[in-house]
Curated annotation (Swiss-Prot):
It comes from the Bacteria. FAD binds at residues 8-22. InterPro entries: FAD/NAD-bd_sf, FixC-like. Gene3D superfamilies: FAD/NAD(P)-binding domain (3.50.50.60). It comes from Sinorhizobium fredii (strain NBRC 101917 / NGR234). This is Protein FixC. Keywords: FAD, Flavoprotein, Nitrogen fixation, Oxidoreductase, Plasmid. Its cofactor is FAD. GO terms for molecular function: oxidoreductase activity. The keyword Oxidoreductase applies. PANTHER family: ELECTRON TRANSFER FLAVOPROTEIN-QUINONE OXIDOREDUCTASE YDIS-RELATED. The lineage of its organism: Bacteria, Pseudomonadati, Pseudomonadota, Alphaproteobacteria, Hyphomicrobiales. GO terms for biological process: nitrogen fixation.
């Protein structure tokens, strides 16, 4: 192995790493993929949402054999206080299309399937292999990797860093800084197992239809965070995540937060009688556009979570990961076909292609949103949810109080909680961050 040279080494076998490895291998490049887990997906027991369009671009016939759980036909958005939720949902029969747009998946199963596709495309995949550091030449160019296996350096023309948000290779090589606590969320998740027919009945589903619930409000106890519930075939993925900086400041327990969420009056009936078999914690990049590090250099590129490519506003991550991996693979293959060296100047093609994609266009649009939610979390995740719940209950409760008095009471509660200036300021800041 030490005497063998590769066109590319991919570090990591998650969504972005698999997309990059598959793209390059399917174009004839000699690719080595290194994964520290026992198998791809071994550290990803949780459920997730798969965005079909992005995978279809890479593997057009993926639906033939991919381990898909349910196709999503309904999306629910909840704003919670301690005893209720106010929300909206969208459900459409259009989502029962021949090639559905979104699916729920179990990452452990899906990542193994994706890795088999990578191998079939011609890449070599080595698991239980930790890359300890990048190998650099005298000029500082990446020329390969050092691993915990015997044999020294494994050489390659370029290294793709797909090591996740807390990967150490880029920081050790000083290609990027350690992500700030306010740019990373910690999500804790559980898998609740129920019979398929019970899930269908509780959520009003048939066949392999699926439903997603996303909730924000007092469930995060004043922190910037989100709760979620995904329906799988015979299980429910439940979780909640908040900024690491807020966990540190409040000393809230992630486990206690999850326990409170699953016992919320709106959630508890959906989980009744379930058996919990799996628990996981996961770090998620939340810094947005302003937290994106340098994406390329001499002999290296960075993709997916390691590049902070996550759209927190729309809760999209796997699609950005797959797309960035694919684009990195396409850029490297194009440079290789021209017989150009993998220099920083040439690898800037990756960034140029990413700039033209939805990935950076979307992240750039919401560049100010992470800071707004981080610095104003109590109002957006406690004050306003409580006021919304009070207003909704006031609206639907029929008790003989004149409607004009109810409207005045709702307005007075808003002004008392935030003041007129506070309300205007929050609305303007939110509008500016959203535009």
């Amino acid at each position: 192995m030490t005497e063998e040279r590769f066109d590319a080494i991919v570090v990591g076998a998650g969504m972005s790493g698999n997309a990059a490895a598959y793209t390059m291998a399917s174009r004839g490049l000699k690719v080595l993929q290194l994964e520290r887990g026992e198998y791809p997906g071994s550290k990803n027991v949780q459920g997730a949402i798969l965005y079909a369009n992005m995978l279809e671009t890479i593997i057009p016939d993926f639906r033939d054999d991919a381990p898909l759980e349910r196709h999503l036909v309904e999306q629910r958005f909840w704003v919670t206080d301690d005893t209720s939720h106010t929300g909206m949902h969208y459900r459409s029969d259009d989502f029962n299309e021949p090639a559905p747009n979104r699916y729920t998946i179990i990452r452990a199963q899906f990542d193994k399937w994706f890795s088999r596709k990578v191998r079939a495309a011609g890449a070599i995949v080595l698991c239980e292999t930790t890359v300890t550091e990048l190998a650099l030449d005298a000029a500082g160019k990446v020329i390969g990797v050092h691993t915990d296996r015997a044999g020294g350096v494994i050489h390659a023309d370029v290294v793709v860093l797909a090591e996740g948000v807390n990967g150490l290779l880029g920081t050790r090589a000083r290609f990027r800084k350690v992500p700030k606590p306010e740019a990373v969320a910690l999500a804790v998740k559980e898998m609740h197992f129920l019979p398929e027919e019970v899930i269908n009945e509780r959520f009003g589903l048939t066949g392999d239809q699926g439903c997603v619930i996303e909730a924000a409000g007092t469930i995060s106890r004043g922190m910037a965070g989100l709760g979620f519930l995904y329906t799988n075939k015979e299980s429910i993925s439940l979780g909640i995540g908040c900024l690491v900086s807020h966990f540190a400041a409040t000393l809230e327990s992630p486990y206690a937060l999850l326990d409170a969420f699953k016992n919320h009056p709106s959630i508890r009936p959906l989980l009744a009688g379930s058996e919990i078999k799996e628990y996981a914690a996961h770090l998620i990049p939340e810094g947005g556009f302003k937290a994106i590090p340098q994406l390329f250099g001499d002999g290296w590129v960075v993709v997916g979570d390691a590049a902070q490519l996550n759209n927190a506003v729309h809760r999209e991550g796997s699609n950005l990961a797959m797309t960035s991996g694919r684009i990195a693979g396409e850029a490297i293959a194009a440079i290789k076909s021209r017989k150009h060296p993998m220099t920083s100047d040439n690898l800037s093609l990756y960034k140029a292609m990413l700039d033209k994609s939805f990935v950076l266009k979307d992240l750039r649009k919401y560049k100010d949103m992470p800071a707004l939610l981080h610095t104003n979390s109590h109002n957006f995740f406690t004050t306003y949810p409580q006021l919304m719940s009070q207003a909704a209950q006031n609206f639907v409760r029929v008790d003989g109080t004149p409607k004009i008095e109810k409207e005045r009471a709702t307005t007075a509660a808003l002004i008392k909680a935030r003041s007129r200036w506070g309300l205007v300021s929050d609305a303007v800041r939110l509008a500016l961050a959203w535009r």
